Amino acid sequence: MAKVPITLVMIIAIVSAAADLGCDYGHHRCYIDVTVENSPRQRHLLSDMDITLQCVRPMAKWFYEDKFQLRATLLRLERAQSGNSGNYGCLDSQNRWYNISLVVGHKEPVGNDIASFVKLEDAPALPESDLFFQPLNESRSLKLLQPLPKTVQRTAGGLFQLNCSPMDPDAKGVNISWLHNDTQILGGRGRIKLKRWSLTVGQLQPEDAGSYHCELCVEQDCQRSNPTQLEVISRKHTVPMLKPGYPRNTSIALGDNVSIECLLEDSALEPKITWLHKGNADNIDDLLQRLREQSQLPVDVTRLITRMDEPQVLRLGNVLMEDGGWYICIAENQVGRTVAASYVDLYSPSDTTTVRTTTTTTVASPIPTASTGEDNDDDVENPAAEASGGVGPPVFRKELKRLQHSLSGNTVNLACPVYGKANITWTKDKKPLNRELGVYVQKNWTLRFVEATSEDSGLYNCKVCNAWGCIQFDFSVQINDRTRSAPIIVVPQNQTVKVNGSLVMKCTVYSDLHPTVSWKRVVLKNASLDGLKSVEIQNLNFTVTNDSVVLTLRNVTFDQEGWYTCLASSGLGRSNSSVYLRVVSPLPPLEIYALLHAHPLGFTLAAITIVALFLLGSAFITFMLRRLRREKLLKLRIETVHQWTKKVIIYRPGGEEGSGCSSGDLQMPVIRIEKQRTTVSTTGTGGTDPAQGFNEYEFPLDSNWEIPRQQLSLGSILGEGAFGRVVMAEAEGLPRSPQLAETIVAVKMVKEEHTDTDMASLVREMEVMKMIGKHINIINLLGCCSQGGPLWVIVEYAPHGNLKDFLKQNRPGAPQRRSDSDGYLDDKPLISTQHLGEKELTKFAFQIARGMEYLASRRCIHRDLAARNVLVSDGYVMKIADFGLARDIQDTEYYRKNTNGRLPIKWMAPESLQEKKYDSQSDVWSYGVLLWEIMTYGDQPYPHILSAEELYSYLITGQRMEKPAKCSLNIYVVMRQCWHFESCARPTFAELVESFDGILQQASSNPNDAYLDLSMPMLETPPSSGDEDDGSDTETFRETSPLRYQYTYKFN
């Protein structure tokens, strides 16, 4: 026997009745066929027996206390205890009902349950074989109604539920706890919900996987369930998944309106929904299979039209007889298709109908070219709730129980709750309600009749209807006459009392006949349980009141600890129930209380002294704190002055920072600078000069890009413009760079004589570079310094300068020299002239096309693509610059460089010259001019054209620049395609990348040489664009009349 607390229960069986019960007490087995009509309906059995109940074949439904248990032919109770006592019933396939009442051993007092029948009084002897004991942990309160599943698979983002209901869910004092990987789960908020007996985990995540089990406890006695292993599967794209129960079959009266819903689970792929109508189909499964295989629609199938904003709902109005039949819903996405059908049955308004809620569903195999996903098997706690508030027939809120059993004199409630508003009609045995004894009470969805009698048994039907249809349900009500039984005993729980204290225990008895009630005590001698000689039964004195028998114990001693049993007997049988009394020692009095009683005056004076000292100390501390506060405020007024600073405010339209460009063109951030008053300390606690700590501008902090100013060491100036300059610097500890490694970067900043407009331009350029992102063929932003000093924008550094100068210095026959003061390289030759041939120039064009392809994919327009705005980095990697400086296009009708007020008209497309229209295709025109620059080693385009009007006249007549001398025909064909007058006829940058990829492969003797190694890591050291350069070699023209040529030429 396990070492657990046990309850001593003494029961003497009725051995004389064992012969006709089909029981073998020697082997502790009992076999009962509940279908035998002449067998008794109430059985009295011993505990610890294996009881088998049999119902007719095939499988029957078993019920315990009117609650469904399982579907089987046999119901087996292993080592049955008093907790298994109660009413059992089975319902066979012919709806025939059989029931039996079992009384097993002794049942612990719970509510008004019938206690065990015993023969304790008037027993001449107590045979040793009839004495046994019941452990506490055998209670039905700690047995699970159903075991937990061993393994469960769920999809990430789905729902996971477990239920640990005990066999007696109404038992009191039962506590439940849930554990995940042996760690207690604390729910109540977030994704984890704990109800009475259930655990629900929503929005599953990978860390939710593991072992789950529950633990039921009654006082100190606990029992743990078997573990359930949860596996969380990552969510992938799947075919459209229908919500359970959709679409629903329905019945509708002629002339009424009906809505059929094809509701789908949420999915990242937007499905396309199609509705078809098929009349009476002989084999609907064949039709669904053909549709699943994506074959052509049959001739006799009609395609229906639904609202574009609500394709999942098909609405039919004023239905006719030809509208009946099958309605097929096809939901399709890139993975596959799901096909489901529902049947619409039409009837005359005078007929009665029952709504059918079945669905025919089939899922197609995935489309061959799309990636397949896994089915979503997430649980849905209440699928019917999805239909609440919708258009359609009523839907029951919960599953209804057909069989209703009760005893005579009880109140019976029948309920048919539905969602929404509807009318309900009740009938009994297909007739209107009519009760001879008593009345029926109807309230909302409930039918109630009190003091039920056997005449109230019958078939009750509820019919609920609304404007779209009706549903109905049948209740089979069986009212049984109350069987007179042995007395029912209600006793208190186990008691605890202090030694020498008093205790009152009441034993309340309910009986059909006048009972005889008494209190007895069971005494164990020598703490032995091995025989009858160690047990003694003592009679106790008690008093009888109107409704109970009271046992009063005074001056309780330790010897009186033990079991006390209340016995009740009548002509119908005997019952008993026990309670355990525990006697404990009182707590010893504390010494402080003894001293208090001995010296009350001394304790009073000490308390008064402590309180007085506390009050005086509080007053002193309050006075000192107020004085220090006044002195601090006075000192602060002396040490502070007020100055005006400028706050930079950045508005990012089209999404959050870092989200890239929105749909359409790049939405430039709006920069506002507002003045505000700032308090500055004049003494500075750090010992620094206040003037050095004061900043003219206050910038918002962006922790993703902010770099400490101490990590930069500024060097020589690379270039200057009208309002800003670019400085070479050494940076330490940049993100994604080796520790303690120094990186050469370029730092952009405004000059001392700058204006607010100049500062806004630099901030706008920085924000645009943040939104565009990183690519190997564009100048990338590395970070910024915006706090504790002027604004520094840190970008990559390109040591070889811009492409235009690079081509000029490396053209055939050119002297190989460079300036020492430009901050780039010394006079060493950049690249051997014999290697800078057409193939290398084509590689340069290929890289620039890749960079422009990336900008176009980000919906960003360059507006000033030219060789002067392409920088040459380490390894002769081309990097596009100045894409962040097309800032004035949205503020004015054209782009004007702030340095010298000139326009790059020779690189502008015709639509940009005429209408100031800029898009990705106008950048393609500029790319063609850039390609011409590359193939001529940096020559100026259109050398003989001097004005915008002359250039537009030259282009509109169909004239284009001639093929360069050292340019192949394939590359010149690409130039001419970029110079197509109609923008829609020009190739895209993606197509240009493919063209140059093919040209490089054809030009290479080794196929592997045709590809550039562009998978190298991002350079951390390239520079900014050369927007602030003086542009001495840039052929641009001053804008003599900004609007004159806009109206001179018109498109046809």
Swiss-Prot record:
GO cellular component entries: cytoneme; plasma membrane; receptor complex
Active site positions, chain numbering: 864
Swiss-Prot/TrEMBL keywords: ATP-binding, Developmental protein, Disulfide bond, Glycoprotein, Immunoglobulin domain, Kinase, Membrane, Nucleotide-binding, Phosphoprotein, Receptor, Repeat, Signal, Transferase, Transmembrane, Transmembrane helix, Tyrosine-protein kinase
Ranges for region Disordered: 358-393, 1017-1038
Modified residues (Phosphotyrosine): 895
Protein EC: 2.7.10.1
Cystines in this chain: 30-90, 164-217, 262-329, 416-462, 507-566
Domain Protein kinase: 712-1000
Transmembrane segments: 601-626
InterPro entries documented for this protein: Ig-like_dom, Ig-like_dom_sf, Ig-like_fold, Ig_I-set, Ig_sub, Ig_sub2, Immunoglobulin_dom, Kinase-like_dom_sf
Catalytic activity, reaction form: L-tyrosyl-[protein] + ATP = O-phospho-L-tyrosyl-[protein] + ADP + H(+)
Tissue: During embryogenesis, expression is seen in mesoderm, endodermal precursor cells, CNS midline cells and trachea and salivary duct ectodermal cells.
Function, in words: May be required for patterning of muscle precursor cells: generation of mesodermal and endodermal layers, invaginations of various types of cells, and CNS formation. Essential for the ability of the migrating tracheal and midline cells to recognize external guiding cues.
Protein's UniProt name: Fibroblast growth factor receptor homolog 2
Gene from which the chain derives: btl
